[in-house]
């Protein structure tokens, strides 16, 4: 559905999908999709799903309070690598922390305010820019005001 409320049917090719990108207008809402899969042995599929879950449990803070991946990968680099290189692994501001386990995840330690999370993210962005010249782009959609400046719908 586009911004005017008109319904569209779009092919996969027209969507121009790439990493963290879709070629359609940002204000469109997707109401359904047809996904193509292939049949497989249920036991093998379950085994593979379990392997993926276990790998994530080792590498990501899946049991912590996070908003998921914080910054998009600045191709060809990986966000966690430039964050780590800038010395931000485990960085804590108020109740917010860059995960020591996977430093592209911000963790709410239990008492983080929106300001703590914003300040931590912006501090990481500044340190990464200073350390290696990379501009990290927020992957988390932020809504509201920060220090008197509207950030509704902005990616930073």
Outline where the language-model segments fall.
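Phosphate/pyrophosphate- and phosphate-bearing ligand-binding catalytic cores of soluble enzymes
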Residues: 2, 7-119, 126-156
């Amino acid at each position: 559905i586009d911004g005017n409320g008109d319904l569209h049917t779009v092919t996969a090719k027209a969507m121009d999908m790439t990493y963290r990108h879709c070629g359609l207008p940002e204000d469109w809402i997707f109401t359904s999709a047809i996904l193509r899969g292939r049949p497989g042995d249920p036991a093998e599929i379950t085994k593979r799903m379990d392997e993926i879950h276990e790998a994530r449990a080792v590498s990501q803070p899946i049991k912590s309070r996070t908003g998921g991946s914080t910054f998009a990968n600045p191709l060809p680099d990986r966000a966690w690598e430039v964050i780590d290189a800038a010395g931000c692994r485990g960085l804590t501001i108020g109740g917010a922390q860059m995960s020591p386990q996977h430093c592209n995840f911000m963790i709410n330690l239990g008492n983080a305010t929106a300001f703590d999370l914003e300040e931590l993210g912006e501090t990481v962005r500044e340190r990464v820019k200073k350390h290696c010249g990379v501009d990290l782009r927020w992957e988390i959609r932020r809504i509201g005001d920060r220090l008197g400046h509207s950030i509704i719908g902005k990616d930073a």
